[in-house]
Each structure stands twice: as structure tokens, then as C-alpha cells.
Amino acid sequence: MFAKALGADKVVGISRSHSKRDDVLKMGADDYIATEDDKDWNKKNRASLDLLICTVSSPKMPLVKYLQLLKTHGQLIQVGVPEDSLPGFNVFSLIMKGAKIGGSSIGNPRQIEDMLTLAAKKSIKPWIEQRPMRDANKAIVDMEDGKARYRYVLVNDQPKL
């Protein structure tokens, strides 16, 4: 949604399985890659992306294959924070393409304000699932089990005084 709002020509969603495909396309992506369901995904999509924003937080992510998706002078920006170090890769693959790896945090207050302004201007709405506050513990367990689609919002279920 934000990539399109910022003028991206083509947006590709990437996840392990096809389970999120329909949602990703509804959010505005033009294409979808399932890394565990399609064994040749990196060959089929080699050198097809200028920018890859990686939200993966697993040290088991297929980093070498992600780097193969980058075009010459492409960039991989890591925003997910793995619990351990990133997987190893051959630096030569970056040098030959002139590719870069970088990182980014959530942003400063001004950038967050700009993002919210853009969201309002382009009518970008979050995909959330409301959960009652009384089920907060269950929501945490469900979130850790990967059941959240895509953010849980805890709602106070106490009557207003």
C-alpha cells in the first residue's frame, strides 16, 4: 500500500507460503513470491527488483536467494531484527552487482508524522483484527504462533462510566 502510494511501478510481496497471496494482492501488490512453495522462485525472479525491504526476523531467512532478486545497484534494506546474526553470504555477489545492504528502524517522529499524513491523503487503512482486552494473554499466544492477520488491536471491553 505504501510502496504504491510512494510511486513504485511494481510491488512484489514475498512470504514463505501462498497463504498470504490473496491478501497481499488485495493490498495492492502486483505479484507474489512463495519461497517455500515454489522451489525455483529465486531463479524465476532473478534480477527483478530494485529494492527489497526485508521484514524477516528469522536468522534462517534465505538471504543469498534474496540477494539474487536484486538488479544491478539494487538494495536490500533490513527492518526485521533477527534474534541471531544474519545468514552468511558471499560478498562477491554484492560487488559484482554494485548492490547494497542497509538497515532502517521505525523512523524519527517527523518521518512517522509524514507517513501518517501520506496514509490519510491516500486513504491507506491498516489491516487489523480487534481482540477484547480480556483475551490479551490469548492474543499474545496467537501472535507468537503467527495467527495474527495482520495486527492485533486490544479493545477495552469494560463499560464506560
Model-predicted segments: where are they?
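N-terminal Rossmann-like NAD(P) cofactor-binding module of classical short-chain dehydrogenase/reductase
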Residues: L52-I53, I77
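Mid-domain Rossmann-like dinucleotide-binding core that forms the NAD(H)/NADP(H) cofactor-binding site
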Residues: M1-D37
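Short, glycine/polar-rich helix-capping loops at beta-to-alpha or helix-loop-helix junctions
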Residues: R16-D23, S85-V91, Q111-I112
